[in-house]
Amino acid sequence: MSTPPTTHATATAPAVTFSTAPSVATLHLVHVGDTEAGMLAEEHGGGVARAAAVITALRQRAGKAVVVHAGDTLIPAPELAVEIPWPADQATPKPKLASPLLVANNSLGLHVAVPGNHDFDLGEAFLADVIKKSSFPWVASTLRIGGGPLAALVEPGPIWLDDTAPAPAAGRIAPRARRCLGERQGDRCDGVVVGVIAAVPESLRLLSAGAQHVEVPADVDGTVAALKAQVDALRAEGTGIVVLLSHRQGITRDFALLQAGLVGVDVIVSGGGENRLVPTGQRHLPGAAVDPLCTSEPLGCYPVWRTARDGAPVALVATDGGLHTVGALSLSFDAAGVATGVEPGSRPWFLDEETLLELRAEVDRGLLRLELGTRDALAPLQEVLGEVDVWLEGRRELVRNQETNLGSLTADALLRAAQRHQPDVVAAFRNSGAIRDSIGVVTPDGRRLGKPVTLLDLKSALRFDSAVVVVELSHAALAATIEAALVGAGTGQGRFPQVSAGVELVFSRSGRDQQVRLEEGRVKEILEPGTRLVRLVVPGPTGPVVIVDGGVVLAPAARVRIATIDYLAGGGDGWFPGQTVVVVPTPSTEHAAFRALVADPAAVRQSLAVTGRVIAAP
């Protein structure tokens, strides 16, 4: 067993003290998260075939592991929409058609998953069908399902997580789960029991319009209370170690759970934030930045350590999204279930050939056929829509924190589409969270270049194809909306704004976030105005119109007409907070708008030439 480390502390990471009692049990946790549609291998690595091979190898190393998914198992994407014959082998003469993405998820060897916000994007009926077809069960401790298609899948009590596929509880949703690390007969476990609970974001209905018949806690305290009830139940059932799958949009929000008093949890697997926790010297996605925690944590960033209010150490782990990495955490515990240290070999494993060799992992030929068949099914989407000679930037860590050329191009497309039907629309505003990928090619030496834009590129980058709408509102309401879009600016929020040409948006990194009250998953009222928006200018019929200057709305009652997408107009991502606005539909969608723009070389050049739209100030 590893030697317990010395107590450490920094200004941001409080002291963590491990038990010095003898270690009597080891938890081997294998985890992924935010895989969305990332089932196909790319030039650098990744893909479901490699992922399944690595997970299998890690399970064999461990002897008895717990394999979990931290949410967002899918997202609206071509890989989900197309169908291929499966199983693709000669032993099945008449294979059924199946979504390759769902087949991929069932091939990973998961014991359990938590539903993420994107799992709801296509509605509860679709998610219910996905869960029914899953080879593993789901856990959602803070999700109250009051009706709708998911209600029939709810398992009121705890479920056991077994190695059989499909699992006995496959296709069910439970508030908590247990896994026996020894031999089990019925509910009797000869060994340590690991409990699994799960949290969804309090903002679930802001993040996904498909969540209609579910309720979530209104705030962090409510989430802590819901989790505590399941922790207490697990402890009463003889559980020794508790793992929390948290899809609350990133590890900093999970720190907040501990600060709010969550106790009894030993490990938190963070999802929804795609925190790239990669220690120095370990391989990761080429060209991608590691999480800042990896340079600030005294005990390293895999895992990150925090202390609960009862003094117990809590390990937090996460992986980047898109099925590029599999995490493997091994922790030792004393007889009281308190962590004594991290076992050697705990690390994130980047899914490349070097990892396969190091782990002696064997890739399943059937999963290689799955990837090949998926590529064949996607081939008709290689229709070229237009030529763009520069890389269009849609990487999450960039587009959610700053202006990017792809964000600007999509906003300009919305404006063009809206103005065809409503000529007096002056600007377009959109969120960054709906931009899911870049468009371009990465050369072997890491350069990012432009390429012909295909239909597949479009469907991969803009996966939701929301309707284009026109919103009429006051200058004060627009300023409040941009304040809502700037909440958490700099921390990778999907609500972060991208704007059309002619807009000048200056925001303060040090400004105060807007505070709101939620009701039934939507912003009911603004409790405290934000102070991030410094300046906002939009085009006008006779020249630029200054809406906000120095943080002050100059003409609050004046009216303006803007283009956006229906998801935001309906209050998604917290936009248009507590407002009743005039929404005028158009016949266009995001895809149609983008296709029209990218087919016009002059319009593309003009759009890409206009930069400096969104400016960060101190």
Predicted stretch roles:
Residues 2-350, 409-416, 428, 472, ...:
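Acidic, metal/ion-coordinating pockets
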Residues 15-28, 32, 36-40, 44-48, ...:
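Catalytic centers of hydrolytic enzymes
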